[in-house]
């Protein structure tokens, strides 16, 4: 359900339904007594919306709730997934990155994995619910949403509860480039990839795969996975039969650890995958085969010796048109690679040249970039429950969106640039 820009109808409905008219009047009176500048400096966005709604109630204005539609999606729409620290019921916030405001929310179950079509035409997630909220019979499902009404257009149950419930890992659930098929990962009882026909609104089958992880689609019937031996597996599948699986060369040794959340541009066919030390592997998958590009170093030898390492949850982002890599870094002890970072480096993906190093001003866990000509850099602080929106060229913080649930972790954008 789409929300109005300032949430006023929802506040009005809540206040009326709970019989809090007197409280609303008192809130309005209190707000009027306080100096405007002081009130605005101290209150959150939610408090400001409540104050405005209470003032409208006191004036007898428009006290009927309304259901609004969100604006049509554009390249600057951003989705923030809040798994709420492994809660059974979760939310995804739909945000207008240009205006810096929440325009809607989508409910999910336990550890949903969101995806969005490159043209912005739909949002989907693979999710899990239980018959008694946090316990009982488990049901896995895929849900598809309209990007304007934010109402579900498909609800597809997955047989035998096959989803891999380990965390909100991007690229454990993926869309094929044509947006017609959703692929999801199964870990137990054996590695497999599930195939869901979004057009037909039906689960199709499970594909047996090697002991490999992540799903990087390159065609409607082909995807790559990363394997334990340091190679990529290419998986070609049809409507039936055994998938055809081939392996690439080993591109990194087993003791050179890659972060859990790489960046992948389907339109460019570019996979960007940093190591724990800041070495960045790049693989060109645009031809349908894997071409390994020269690795680049995000950090200097002196910085690495001084304890600088990548860190965060969603640590790396890639801008297709500019061919730039964005990576969160900070000084940290070894094995602290999932802790938040205070700085970000920008690299030319082709040459490895460092173009910028930004002080983010906050402890940042996850990043992403809009794919338009003058991109926005999205920086999410799980601790602050806030999305900070920066100019990706200068690093300047432009605006922020706060009160994003309990523990927001993952930023998803559409490549509409």
Curated annotation (Swiss-Prot):
One of its GO terms (cellular component) is periplasmic space. Residues 1-28 form the signal peptide. One of its GO terms (molecular function) is methylamine dehydrogenase (amicyanin) activity. Keywords: Disulfide bond, Electron transport, Oxidoreductase, Periplasm, Signal, Transport. One of its GO terms (biological process) is methylamine metabolic process. It catalyses: 2 oxidized [amicyanin] + methylamine + H2O = 2 reduced [amicyanin] + formaldehyde + NH4(+) + 2 H(+). It comes from the Bacteria. It is found in: Periplasm. Its EC number is 1.4.9.1. Disulfide bonds join 212-227. The keyword Repeat does not apply. Tetramer of two light and two heavy chains. Belongs to the aromatic amine dehydrogenase heavy chain family. Methylamine dehydrogenase carries out the oxidation of methylamine. Electrons are passed from methylamine dehydrogenase to amicyanin. NCBIfam families: TTQ_MADH_Hv. This is Methylamine dehydrogenase heavy chain. The lineage of its organism: Bacteria, Pseudomonadati, Pseudomonadota, Alphaproteobacteria, Rhodobacterales. The gene is mauB.
């Amino acid at each position: 359900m789409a929300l109005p820009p300032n949430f006023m109808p929802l506040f009005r409905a809540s206040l009326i339904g709970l019989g809090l008219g007197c409280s609303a009047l008192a809130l309005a009176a209190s707000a009027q007594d306080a100096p405007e500048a002081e009130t605005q400096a101290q209150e959150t966005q939610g408090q400001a919306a409540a104050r405005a709604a209470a003032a409208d109630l006191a004036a007898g204005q428009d006290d009927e709730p309304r259901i609004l539609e969100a604006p049509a999606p554009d390249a600057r729409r951003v989705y923030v997934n809040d798994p709420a620290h492994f809660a059974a019921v979760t939310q995804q916030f739909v945000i207008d990155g240009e205006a810096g405001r929440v325009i809607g929310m989508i409910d999910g179950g336990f550890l949903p994995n969101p995806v969005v079509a490159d043209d912005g035409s739909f949002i989907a997630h693979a999710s899990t619910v239980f018959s008694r909220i946090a316990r009982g019979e488990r049901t896995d499902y895929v849900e598809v949403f309209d990007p304007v009404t934010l109402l579900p257009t498909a609800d597809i149950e997955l047989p035998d509860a096959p989803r891999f419930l380990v965390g909100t890992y991007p690229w454990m659930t993926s869309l094929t480039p044509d947006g017609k098929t959703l692929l999801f990962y199964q870990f137990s009882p054996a590695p497999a990839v599930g195939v869901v026909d979004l057009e037909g609104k039906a689960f199709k089958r499970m594909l047996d795969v090697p002991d490999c992880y992540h799903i990087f689609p390159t065609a409607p019937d082909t995807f790559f996975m990363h394997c334990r031996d340091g190679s990529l597996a290419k998986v070609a599948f049809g409507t039936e039969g055994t998938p055809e699986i081939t392996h690439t060369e080993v591109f990194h040794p087993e003791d050179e650890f890659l972060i859990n959340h790489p960046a992948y541009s389907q339109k460019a066919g570019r996979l960007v995958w940093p190591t724990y030390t800041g070495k960045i592997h790049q693989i060109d998958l645009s031809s349908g085969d894997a071409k390994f590009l020269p690795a680049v170093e995000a950090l200097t030898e002196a910085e690495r010796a001084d304890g600088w390492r990548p860190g965060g949850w969603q640590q790396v982002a890639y801008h297709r048109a500019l061919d730039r890599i964005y990576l969160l870094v900070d000084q940290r002890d070894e094995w602290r690679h999932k802790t938040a970072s205070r700085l970000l480096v920008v690299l030319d993906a082709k040459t490895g040249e460092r173009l910028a190093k930004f002080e983010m001003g906050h402890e940042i866990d996850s990043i992403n970039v809009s794919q338009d000509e003058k991109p926005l850099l999205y920086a999410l602080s799980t601790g602050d429950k806030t999305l900070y929106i920066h100019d990706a060229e200068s690093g300047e913080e432009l605006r922020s969106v706060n009160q994003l649930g309990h523990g927001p972790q993952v930023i998803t954008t559409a490549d509409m640039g």
